[in-house]
Swiss-Prot record:
Optimum temperature is 45 degrees Celsius. Optimum pH is 6.0. This is Bifunctional protein MdtA. GO terms for cellular component: cytoplasm. It holds the Pfam family Mpt_N. It comes from Methylorubrum extorquens (strain ATCC 14718 / DSM 1338 / JCM 2805 / NCIMB 9133 / AM1) (Methylobacterium extorquens). One of its GO terms (molecular function) is methylenetetrahydrofolate dehydrogenase (NADP+) activity. Its EC number is 1.5.1.-, 1.5.1.5. Gene3D superfamilies: Methylene-tetrahydromethanopterin dehydrogenase, N-terminal domain, NAD(P)-binding Rossmann-like Domain.
Length: 288
């Protein structure tokens, strides 16, 4: 049996140590990482993966695209897929900055906690202009939720919403939430609230969500205090607070890691797997 080889194409200068560790834990026998990968130089790397093994042996080679910039990762991922033709292809996965696995885990846990459906309900993503927030908005909208993607500046929030709508064929709206007052206003009438902001910034004080009767579930992706949502713990995984449930970053992170490992394992099950947000989310729902 051929060794399971994972080639890590990273858009940053140095390939992610985190992704290497999870890659091995997911079943790879050997990982080779390349930094500063772009759509212009990735072709030669892809050729090395698709022309070296034949038949069933080809499924023992796989590609992982990562790095800190999701937009750059998406461009590289598209270039990788365009290089494939006929049987000359290997399985590939996109998870720049952990965005796909993190968002998939968070949304899957919330949907499960909501009874399996969020259709027709309102979901607000605060500080949603980054890759995790955008992916979360996309997955929630794909589940039929009415999604509002919020940012400090309306033009940036609108650009993020437009990007999500174009990529995922959904209808996410944008809102400006520059301060505590506007964020508290934005979550009024919402059933679900996600916070995807930078480290060290509380986006939603405890009173703003605990006193809003419509809110059923809150979820925060920031593990470092102060958390994005006041009054919860990073380890919360569906913990109840006055009839509402909360998910903290570490509560979500357990599934995120299991999901990442499971995706790596699946890369080696065939030579035709493509794991982007939709495919990763499908697996997350099975695992949640």
């Amino acid at each position: 049996m051929s060794k399971k080889l994972l080639f890590q194409f990273d858009t940053d200068a140095t390939p992610s140590v985190f992704d290497v560790v999870v890659g091995y834990d997911g079943g790879a026998d050997h990982i080779t990482g390349y930094g500063n990968v772009t759509p212009d130089n990735v072709g030669a790397y892809v050729d090395g993966t698709i022309y070296t093994r034949g038949g069933k042996e080809k499924q023992s080679t796989a590609i992982f695209v990562g790095g800190g910039d999701m937009a750059a990762g998406e461009r590289v991922f598209e270039a990788v897929k365009k290089r494939f033709f006929g049987p000359f292809r290997v399985s590939c996965m996109l998870d720049s900055n952990g965005s796909n696995t993190t968002a998939a885990a968070g949304v899957a846990l919330v949907v499960k906690a909501a009874g399996g459906s969020v259709k027709g309900k309102k979901a607000v993503v605060l500080a949603g202009t980054g890759p995790v927030g955008m992916r979360s908005a996309a997955l929630l909208a794909g589940e039929g939720a009415e999604v509002v993607l919020c940012g400090r500046k309306l033009d940036k929030a609108q650009a993020a919403a437009d990007s999500v709508n174009k990529r995922f064929k959904v209808n996410v709206t944008a809102a400006e939430t520059a301060d505590d007052a506007s964020r508290a206003e934005a979550v009024k009438g919402a059933h679900f609230v996600f916070t995807a902001g930078a480290i060290g910034l509380e986006l939603l004080p405890q009173a703003a969500w605990q006193n809003e009767s419509s809110i059923e579930i809150v979820a925060d992706y920031n593990a470092q205090p102060p958390l994005g949502i006041g009054g919860i713990d990073a380890t919360d995984k569906g913990k109840e607070y006055g009839g509402k449930r909360a998910f903290g970053a570490l509560g979500i992170g357990g599934l995120k890691l299991k999901l990442h490992r499971a995706c790596i394992a699946k890369l080696f099950e065939s030579s035709e797997g493509v794991f982007d947000a939709e495919e990763i989310y499908k697996l997350a729902k099975e695992m949640a």
